Amino acid sequence: MAHKKGQGASRNGRDSESKRLGMKVGAGQRVSTGSILVRQRGTKWHPSKNVGRGRDDTLFALIDGIVVTRKTDRTYISVLPE
């Protein structure tokens, strides 16, 4: 006889709620001051010109302008004035 019950469904079905991380605006889009550009854990994307970094590594715009991404050894996000 089996020493485990063959019930599956009632004991499964747990998962954590998604955290909605990632880019919130794409390159070339217009943003206003304080707009969230990226939600992330750690620094997958790094702040560059006119971009601030919050305590939870969220990147946000410091000025009104256009979002620009640049990839070297790291991916940088900046906001250029219009």
From Swiss-Prot:
Pfam families linked: Ribosomal_L27 (PF01016)
GO terms, molecular function: structural constituent of ribosome
Region annotation Disordered: where it falls in the sequence: 1-51
Any one Gene Ontology BP term: translation
Domain of life: Bacteria
Leader sequence residues: none
NCBIfam families (alphabetical): L27
Protein name: Large ribosomal subunit protein bL27
Native species: Chlamydia abortus (strain DSM 27085 / S26/3) (Chlamydophila abortus)
Gene name of this polypeptide: rpmA
